[in-house]
């Protein structure tokens, strides 16, 4: 396919003349006849799901094509594909959501089928229809089913007509704000506002009273439009103690439909799942059978084939389940189902797309053991789980095995940008029963190493270790109801003292380990090598007892309350051990360190030996040091006091973030993002709690409110402007 042809296609597409593109693709010699099997798949997605689809395709001997934006040029999914095509700038609207551009990529590479993954175009009936009209195989359900189920209002009307129980609500076409507010009052507060299209919790708002309705409704519309291109909304009665249980269904083109049991996705933050499991705990076999049958009936009602998920909300007080929505795609959490049924669902998708019947009947679908999935995100947990951006300076996932999977789309050195979802990886584990699987989950979380961006790993460890989670007492408000256990409480002196004691122990381990590294580093530098990142202190006298002081600033990663300086005396003893002195009449700690790798150590203290790992990188004039041992992970930093070689510093992440102090009353950005809307003017009088501006990052909106009453001063931003985390937005003058 010549570049002249591509340009001609683009010209016609821009004139909204899609017919030429359809005719071109349909007539291409590379398009497969219907009786042939798929030989080349274009994956219209990015990140971990693109890598996961390609893995199965390659196992089946199918060639793969990746698409990428400028931000993803060097991403893992691009490297994993046989071919890759650039589709536009970083903005998802101009790249991964551009169906016509993706169709051009398919024509250019001779792909016979398109797998949409999840998100982006996966639930676009228009895109599925374009594939069908163009002679391409869309690896997913028919466009008609996506259309019926993609509109949540329409899907609820269909399910209601089919006798599936529904939560009371409004699913009509009238979207006038006054009409919607009137409907909300009829339903009765609290209510939940949901976009009629899309998923992932985007655009969802819980409204407790009428006074909050207008702001929530308009915010939901904006977020829905930004994420899905459609801003229509539905309203539902908000069930106060619900469980979120979904059923994996599968159909083929021969009329067969079955379910592969259920998943519990109740543990959520910001209306997004973070730990999923299969099967759901604490339900009866009768409940499971009824739920599965309801899901199959829902799929049959719309002539469904390929992979889909029917989501139900379960009232924990009555044990009644209600249809919530149907996701017409492969779900993020599909691996937990794969683990308990022993099947590759992407392979099923491809075979169904080829016209093959389902490989099993309902009675043949096995269920073995229990599986968990934990989603590892780049996010600031102390800041309300706000998404974070930055470089993965250190990335060491756990080792995979038949019972442990790591689904990821990143490598060490990659950047987590503001343009896409901040997920780093999915950790999936299997055990013979729920207890065994939970033990494995906690162990793997303890050994999953990420440094360079804040993550939710520590929070996931707390969730997995909670006594109520251990017995399966889960519901969607689990985090809110147990926040005193899950979040650090600075007002509890005993808990604070225990936490700080653990930090000081980690600091002692860091001091001993970096002293060990510095011995070898000094020897290397004496032979003409430039000091590495680890060298920051004078060398010890090797054959005599010597002492140095190491100062570490502790970044309080739990509470996000700043740094604490820890000063340690490190005494090198003739027998090769270290004596760590913390001062303040604290007892000394004797440590013996054996180097087990570049940054891995075996440390013995008081007859107890343990594995310790360190990672370090340069950022903002500091050496940042992370330590992992047992279930502990802490981070420290040291002011860099020597010059490093250009090569040494060149590979480290450097930012231009603001480090100077701000005038009193200055409000700074809680995250990097795009200013969507500025709601007031400079010098305007505002009340405490009044919304001032709206930020968007990773398609999620965050409203910045006035912390106190006063007048707005030094308003520095406008709509459409990008801001960095911690940059000044405005000032409140009382």
Curated annotation (Swiss-Prot):
The active site is at residue 329. The modification N6-biotinyllysine is found at residue 699. Residues 657-733 form the Biotinyl-binding domain. ATP binds at residues 152, 236, 271. Pfam families: Biotin_carb_C (PF02785), Biotin_carb_N (PF00289), Biotin_lipoyl (PF00364), CPSase_L_D2 (PF02786), MCCA_BT (PF19331). One of its GO terms (molecular function) is ATP binding. Mn(2+) 1 binds at residues 311, 325. It comes from the Eukaryota. PROSITE patterns: ATP_GRASP, BC, BIOTIN, BIOTINYL_LIPOYL, CPSASE_1, CPSASE_2. Its cofactor is biotin; Mn(2+). Residues 37-484 form the Biotin carboxylation domain. The keyword Glycoprotein does not apply. Pathway: Amino-acid degradation; L-leucine degradation; (S)-3-hydroxy-3-methylglutaryl-CoA from 3-isovaleryl-CoA: step 2/3. Temporal and spatial accumulation of the alpha and beta subunits during development at approximately equal molar ratios. NCBIfam families: PRK08591.1. This is Methylcrotonoyl-CoA carboxylase subunit alpha, mitochondrial. It comes from Arabidopsis thaliana (Mouse-ear cress).
């Amino acid at each position: 396919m010549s570049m002249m042809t591509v340009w001609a296609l683009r010209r016609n597409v821009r004139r909204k003349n899609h017919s030429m593109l359809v005719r071109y693709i349909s007539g291409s010699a590379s398009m497969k006849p219907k009786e042939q099997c798929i030989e080349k798949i274009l994956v219209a997605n990015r990140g971990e799901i693109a890598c996961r689809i390609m893995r199965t395709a390659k196992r089946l001997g199918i060639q793969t094509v990746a698409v990428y934006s400028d931000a993803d040029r060097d991403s893992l999914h691009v490297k994993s594909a046989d071919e890759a095509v650039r589709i536009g700038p970083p903005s998802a609207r101009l790249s991964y959501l551009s169906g016509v551009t993706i169709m051009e990529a398919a024509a250019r590479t001779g792909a016979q089928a398109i797998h949409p993954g999840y998100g982006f175009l996966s639930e676009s009936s228009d895109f599925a229809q374009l594939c069908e009209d163009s002679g391409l195989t869309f690896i997913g359900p028919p466009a008609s089913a996506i259309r019926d189920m993609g509109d949540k209002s329409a899907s609820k009307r269909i399910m209601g007509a089919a006798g599936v129980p529904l939560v009371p609500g409004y699913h009509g076409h009238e979207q006038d704000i006054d009409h919607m507010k009137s409907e909300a009052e009829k339903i009765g507060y609290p209510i939940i506002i949901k976009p009629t299209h899309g998923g992932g919790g985007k655009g969802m708002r819980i409204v407790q009273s009428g006074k909050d309705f207008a702001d929530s409704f308009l915010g939901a519309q904006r977020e829905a439009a930004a994420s899905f291109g459609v801003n229509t909304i539905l309203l539902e009665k908000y069930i106060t103690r619900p469980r979120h249980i979904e059923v994996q269904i599968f159909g083929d083109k021969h009329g067969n439909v079955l379910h592969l049991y259920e998943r519990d996705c109740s543990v959520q933050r910001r209306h997004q799942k973070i730990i999923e499991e299969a099967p759901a705990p604490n339900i009866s076999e009768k409940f499971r059978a009824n739920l599965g049958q309801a899901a199959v009936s829902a799929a049959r009602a719309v002539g469904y084939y390929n992979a889909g998920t029917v989501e139900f909300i379960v009232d924990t007080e009555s044990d009644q389940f209600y249809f919530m929505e149907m996701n017409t795609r492969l779900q993020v959490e599909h691996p937990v189902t794969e683990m308990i049924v022993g099947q590759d669902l992407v392979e099923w998708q491809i075979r169904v797309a080829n016209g093959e019947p389902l490989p099993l009947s309902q009675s043949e679908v096995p269920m073995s053991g229990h599986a968990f999935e934990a989603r590892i995100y780049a996010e600031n947990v102390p800041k309300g789980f706000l998404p974070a951006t930055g470089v993965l300076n250190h990335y060491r996932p756990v080792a995979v095995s038949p019972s442990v999977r790591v689904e990821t789309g990143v490598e060490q050195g990659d950047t987590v940008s503001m343009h896409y979802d901040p997920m780093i990886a999915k950790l999936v584990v299997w055990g013979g029963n729920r207890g065994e699987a939970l033990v494995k989950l906690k162990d793997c979380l303890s050994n999953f190493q990420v440094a360079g961006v804040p993550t939710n790993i520590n929070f996931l460890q707390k969730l997995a270790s909670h006594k109520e989670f251990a017995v399966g007492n889960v519901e969607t408000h689990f985090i809110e109801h147990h926040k005193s256990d899950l979040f650090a409480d600075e007002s509890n002196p005993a808990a604070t003292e225990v936490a700080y004691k653990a930090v000081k122990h980690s600091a002692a381990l860091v001091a001993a380990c970096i002293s060990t590294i510095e011995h070898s580093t000094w020897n290397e530098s004496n032979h003409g090598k430039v000091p590495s990142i680890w060298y920051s202190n004078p060398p010890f006298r090797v054959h005599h007892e010597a002492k140095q002081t190491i100062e570490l600033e502790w970044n309080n990663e739990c509470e996000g309350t700043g740094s604490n300086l820890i000063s340690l005396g490190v005494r090198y003893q003739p027998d090769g051990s270290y004596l760590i002195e913390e001062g303040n009449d604290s007892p000394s700690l004797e440590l013996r360190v054996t180097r087990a790798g570049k940054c891995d150590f075996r440390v013995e203290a008081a007859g107890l030996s343990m594995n310790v790992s360190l990672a370090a990188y340069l950022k903002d004039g500091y050496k940042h040091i992370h330590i992992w041992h047992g279930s502990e992970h802490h981070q420290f930093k040291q002011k860099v006091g020597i010059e490093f070689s250009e090569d040494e510093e060149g590979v480290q992440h450097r930012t231009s973030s603001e480090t100077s102090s701000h005038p009193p009353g200055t409000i700074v950005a809680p995250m990097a993002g795009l200013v969507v809307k500025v709601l007031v003017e400079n010098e305007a009088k505002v009340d405490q709690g009044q919304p001032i501006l709206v930020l968007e990052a990773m398609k999620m909106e965050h409203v910045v409110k006035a912390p106190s009453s006063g007048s707005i001063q030094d308003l520095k931003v406008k709509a459409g402007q990008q801001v960095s985390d911690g940059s000044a937005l405005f000032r409140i003058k009382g």
